[in-house]
Amino acid sequence: MRDLPFTLDQLRILKAIVKEGSFKRAADSLYVSQPAISLQIQNLEKQLNIPLFERSNKKATLTEAGNLLLRYGGRILALCEETCRALEDVQNLQGGNLVIGASQTTGTYLMPRLIGLFRQRYPQVNVQLQVHSTRLISWSVANGQVDLAVIGGEVPNELKDTLQVTSYAEDELALILPTSHVFSKLPDIQKEDLYRLRFIALDTQSTIRKVIDKILIQHDIDSSRFKIEMELNSIEAIKNAVQSGLGAAFVSVSAIAKELELGILHWAKIENVTIKRMLSIIINPNRYKSKAAETFSKEILTLFVTPAA
């Protein structure tokens, strides 16, 4: 068996340099000196007998060989981390890490409650929550950076053969209005009334907006005719804008529980129209699933949201 021309530490250093963009910042992130970083890279290039970085510019730019080593090195480091976690599982949830991913709305309003309950039951497990777009979270699960995730949209087409997607629960979306709006006095509104409203919306690339547009079309409602007053980048900003009387909006019911209880927002029902999306749990079946992830799936995820029949 041949000796390896690199060490795990050298692979970590290479990854850090690319991530941080320079030798100095990589050294700071690894809590070592810059000369030590440079020496490790010089030794690595000598062992491989090939340059890994372009020496013609100040930025840390990889050569073709450097990119190749980075790609395979990342997989090696991920497998080492996976091995360590598998060994930790021998301790039966007496420690270890659990990284959970979620898309924006789910990660903001549902997952913190579930993670809080899990920590009460298993305080020894270190739980991290990553909240990003459905696309970014899907890639994190595929790459092994996240154990499992709950998302509200579809995984990217290029990952559908990689990820296992399981329907989890229905998430109803509500049309919210200021309590002072004339429509808030009605038991429900008609489809045609939607075209008279001014809307506060997420940007056109958001998962929720795409789902809403798709479902409205199924009910013969053309969302392209809506008067969009403004586009905001967070649900909290949208709720505040609606509460201030700036317009109407569609948001997840899970995001407005407190506001409905306090009576500061109105949930307007549309006659014969119900807008729901399916939340999904995604995992990478080709990667090791820790006992912490298995326990979270079986004990916690089923507690707050009842799956659709």
Curated annotation (Swiss-Prot):
According to the entry, DNA is bound by residues in: 23-42
List, in alphabetical order, the Gene Ontology terms for molecular function in this entry.
DNA-binding transcription factor activity; transcription cis-regulatory region binding
Output the superkingdom of the source species. Answer: Eukaryota
| Record-annotated HTH lysR-type domain positions | 6-63
User: Where in the cell is the protein located?
Assistant: Plastid, Chloroplast
GO cellular component, as recorded: chloroplast
- Can the keyword Lipid metabolism be found in this entry's annotation? no
Keywords of the record, alphabetical order, are: Chloroplast, DNA-binding, Plastid, Transcription, Transcription regulation
Known function? Trans-acting transcriptional regulator of RuBisCO genes (rbcL and rbcS) expression.
Per the record, the similarity remark reads: Belongs to the LysR transcriptional regulatory family.
Q: What's the protein here called? A: Probable RuBisCO transcriptional regulator
| Organism ancestry | Eukaryota, Rhodophyta, Florideophyceae, Rhodymeniophycidae, Gracilariales
| Encoding gene, per UniProt annotation | rbcR
